C-alpha cells in the first residue's frame, strides 16, 4: 500500500514526521481525510483533532487550535498554531 509522507509542525518546530497510511484533520468546512493518491489540496483548519495512522496501525492524535493542511504528491504538511498530544500508540481497527 502506498504511503503518505507527513510533517506536523507548529511555531516551535516539528511535532511529528514520518510515513502514514491516513491523515484526518478538522478542516474549516468539515473533517478531511487524506489517503495516498489524494488530489492536491490546501485547507484551513479549525479547532479539533488531527489524527495520523501509521501503516502498522499505530494512531497518533493531537488537539489543534487551527492552522492549515497542504497535500501534494503524497506529501502532507500540517501547520498548526498550537497542538497538544491526546494519545499515542493506540491501534487503529
Q: What label would you give each PLM region?
A:
Residues 5-93:
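Compact, glycine-rich, soluble single-domain proteins
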Residues 1-2:
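N-terminal helix initiation/capping motif
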